[in-house]
């Protein structure tokens, strides 16, 4: 608390710092936002929209810095003091129960389209689409051409002939271009509260850490889960998610070993006998007929006939399919006429 040299420090500043410290103690998540570029009208709309989600408190940067540093010293939390290092431009304090990542997304989603000012850096390629501007011929035609747009007169109105990138990403917007974009109603930028940093549980999160690609993040989580799942199954480390697959894999492998080694169980006896029978017929078919009795000859003959019938049936089916395709072709041709 500020108690010394009160004659040199305005009383309202002392009171403001104390009020800020009291506010900072209330939040689970404490964040700093930059609101320098937000017009008064949009700022009021933002405050109305976030009123139920967070508390926004504006003050001077010097007083916010003093409040953070004093509170960090009083609570013996040097990590909290690092939050003050993120202060810049027109900062304000945000107090909320939302985690920093959700807070960042909420503030980004709350930004509104706005005209871009001269001297600003284009956040992405600024494109003016082809089409009528709805404006009658006049001096504005020259302004459009002066800004580099292919402007023409079409049906008594000024029109843009082709889609045109008027400013590339990273380039500075010139005064001429800024005027033209504003007149055309193009709003290539967004205004809102820019999150500078957020503090939670001893960690200061800067905006670059909080800015994540949600789709990529979900894909990474899914990929990690798949890798962990496969590792658990292949290493036979049972978990709630993998126990069923591990048991199925173990059963399949055990059954294969049992069949291959002719180890009879109630689960493999049919497969083993079937395999032995097939092997017996294979050996019998390789032996001469004089080595077989009548029963075995009949079995070998039946198997051979079944194989031949299957081989003859396959080409027949292929011919029928080809015939159907030939019959469908003229019909399809007629269909093209209607």
From Swiss-Prot:
CDD domains: Ribosomal_P0_L10e
Keyword Zinc: no
GO cellular component, one term: cytosolic large ribosomal subunit
Pfam families named among the record's database cross-references: Ribosomal_L10, RL10P_insert
SUPFAM superfamilies: Ribosomal protein L10-like
Superkingdom as given in the UniProt entry: Archaea
UniProt KW keywords: Ribonucleoprotein, Ribosomal protein, RNA-binding, rRNA-binding
Acidic residues bias (residue ranges): 319-329
Gene Ontology MF term list: large ribosomal subunit rRNA binding; structural constituent of ribosome
BP term (GO), one: cytoplasmic translation
Quaternary context: Part of the 50S ribosomal subunit. Forms part of the ribosomal stalk which helps the ribosome interact with GTP-bound translation factors. Forms a heptameric L10(L12)2(L12)2(L12)2 complex, where L10 forms an elongated spine to which the L12 dimers bind in a sequential fashion.
Function: Forms part of the ribosomal stalk, playing a central role in the interaction of the ribosome with GTP-bound translation factors.
Family under the similarity heading: Belongs to the universal ribosomal protein uL10 family.
Protein name as annotated: Large ribosomal subunit protein uL10
């Amino acid at each position: 608390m500020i108690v010394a040299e009160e004659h040199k420090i305005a009383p309202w500043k002392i009171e403001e710092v104390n009020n800020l410290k009291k506010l900072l103690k209330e939040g689970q998540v404490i964040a700093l936002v930059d609101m320098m570029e937000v017009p008064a009208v949009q700022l009021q709309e933002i405050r109305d929209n976030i009123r139920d989600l967070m508390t926004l408190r504006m003050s001077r940067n010097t007083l916010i810095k003093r409040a953070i540093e004093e509170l960090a010293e009083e609570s013996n939390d040097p990590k909290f003091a690092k939050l003050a290092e993120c202060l810049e431009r027109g900062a304000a304090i945000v107090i909320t129960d939302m985690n920093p990542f959700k807070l960042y997304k909420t503030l980004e989603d709350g930004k509104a389209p706005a005209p871009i000012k001269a001297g600003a850096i284009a956040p992405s390629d600024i494109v003016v689409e082809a089409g009528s501007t709805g404006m009658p011929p006049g001096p504005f035609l020259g302004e459009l051409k002066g800004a580099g747009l292919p402007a023409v007169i079409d049906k008594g109105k000024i029109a843009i002939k082709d889609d045109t990138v008027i400013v590339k990403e990273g380039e500075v917007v010139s005064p001429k271009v800024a005027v033209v974009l504003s007149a055309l109603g193009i709003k290539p930028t967004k205004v809102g509260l820019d999150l500078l940093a957020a503090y939670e549980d001893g960690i200061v999160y800067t905006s670059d850490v909080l800015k994540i690609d949600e789709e990529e993040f979900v894909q990474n989580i899914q990929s990690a889960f798949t890798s962990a799942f496969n590792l658990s199954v292949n290493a036979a480390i049972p978990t709630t998610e993998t126990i069923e697959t591990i048991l199925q894999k173990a059963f399949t492998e055990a059954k294969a070993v049992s069949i291959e080694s002719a180890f009879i169980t109630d689960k493999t006896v049919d497969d083993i006998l079937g395999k032995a029978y097939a092997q017996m017929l294979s050996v019998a078919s390789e032996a001469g007929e004089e080595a077989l009795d009548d029963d075995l000859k009949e079995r070998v003959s039946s198997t051979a006939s079944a194989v031949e019938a299957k081989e003859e049936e396959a080409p027949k089916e292929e011919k029928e399919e080809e015939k159907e395709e030939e019959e469908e072709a003229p019909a399809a041709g007629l269909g093209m006429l209607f």
